[in-house]
Amino acid sequence: MLASTFSYRMYKTALILAALLGSGQAQQVGTSQAEVHPSMTWQSCTAGGSCTTNNGKVVIDANWRWVHKVGDYTNCYTGNTWDTTICPDDATCASNCALEGANYESTYGVTASGNSLRLNFVTTSQQKNIGSRLYMMKDDSTYEMFKLLNQEFTFDVDVSNLPCGLNGALYFVAMDADGGMSKYPTNKAGAKYGTGYCDSQCPRDLKFINGQANVEGWQPSSNDANAGTGNHGSCCAEMDIWEANSISTAFTPHPCDTPGQVMCTGDACGGTYSSDRYGGTCDPDGCDFNSFRQGNKTFYGPGMTVDTKSKFTVVTQFITDDGTSSGTLKEIKRFYVQNGKVIPNSESTWTGVSGNSITTEYCTAQKSLFQDQNVFEKHGGLEGMGAALAQGMVLVMSLWDDHSANMLWLDSNYPTTASSTTPGVARGTCDISSGVPADVEANHPDAYVVYSNIKVGPIGSTFNSGGSNPGGGTTTTTTTQPTTTTTTAGNPGGTGVAQHYGQCGGIGWTGPTTCASPYTCQKLNDYYSQCL
């Protein structure tokens, strides 16, 4: 509680200071390259199975952009080092430097088409670009804010070209909808230029935070030619829907004492970028579900139950205690759909850690068995994660390699000095020598990930639980509105009988209430029962 209160006071102080600085010392916008956001559609669905297509856009994060002196082409930042003549301190740097528009395909390897977004790993133009991080936008100056309590989030993904050491991550963070522009008048770039990022690691590698540069105390990275760390970090709650390559995957909630964006200082930030990992106000570890780590070593991967050699659908459900969007988050469930078949998440096989979803009971038992610090509970657990989901979060789609731990925490044995037979150590089949960024960048420059077919709606509305079509079993009709398309999902219960994992009851449910043999209708809450 003390940490939470302290963070809130720091946050309010930062707001006041930013306002006092005025527009004379501002994070500027360049004029050399027009910023044109690639279009990407996604769908919002209703309980009846009707889905409306939204014409969204994506924007690349400010950290990837060219930063140059206002009025000419002199770099403010080259490689992993600031020009201290232009940038002697945070405020002066923000006043002197501008973020430039992006050429998405040729510079960053980002291509969008319809409901699909492809992110290439290495792209070489005038400079070599590694990976990318993009946000879904509502319009050209505002991020789309997703509120997922009592909802499910569904998307298709192709990870077939992601080897060991890479992470195609799709997740949510509690950024400000305008990128912090209204809170911090010195931020003149805003969401249009991808500002305002934060996550549960309280990253200190950001070049700009709260409308100021992060040059003070900046230390160039010893193993990343493009990055470094400054005195400040940017914290907020994070819901990792999907962190994956073709070998391993995990989904992980990360709560914070204050759900929204808060600036931190030095090692008090905690997380990956600080000497005291658990010294901050966020949970850097989260409560993860990695099927391999939970004991099922044949569930996810090439040729396995979820076959990563081809595209599949990922369904994540955020279930509340009362079945409403104002309830308390009590469970995060996961399903997959591939080749017309609904695949439930694998069960944990460890004695004492049961289930195939994230609950408070699962997290407590898992942390105990794996001998991990229960920082998840300390920072609010599922209730804390639910607070962030309730206020709205920004969708992030990214591809990255790991200069801190070579992604071994996702796809190999970690820590590498521990025995692979120790509970929680083995996370995938990748060798402990794999994932070194220099090696991955040299050997797999053609790696890529594709995200597509994003749908959001009430539990059971975004995919066909009867299992006839991995895309949701929908038929499409065009409405008279020029910017929307309405689709209607096929009946998840078939001909009067709900199939495995289909809805079979709940307040307001008018579909089938009988389950196909041998399944029975089990009540999850007053509003949703499911064939299990």
UniProtKB/Swiss-Prot annotation:
Species annotation: Aspergillus fumigatus (strain ATCC MYA-4609 / CBS 101355 / FGSC A1100 / Af293)
CDD domains: GH7_CBH_EG
Its EC number(s): 3.2.1.91
Annotated gene: cbhB
Tree of life domain: Eukaryota
PANTHER family: 1,4-BETA-D-GLUCAN CELLOBIOHYDROLASE B (PTHR33753), GLYCOSIDE HYDROLASE FAMILY 7 PROTEIN (PTHR33753:SF2)
Compartmental location: Secreted
Catalytic activity: Hydrolysis of (1->4)-beta-D-glucosidic linkages in cellulose and cellotetraose, releasing cellobiose from the non-reducing ends of the chains
UniProt-recorded name of the protein: Probable 1,4-beta-D-glucan cellobiohydrolase B
GO cellular component: extracellular region
Disulfide topology: C504-C521, C515-C531
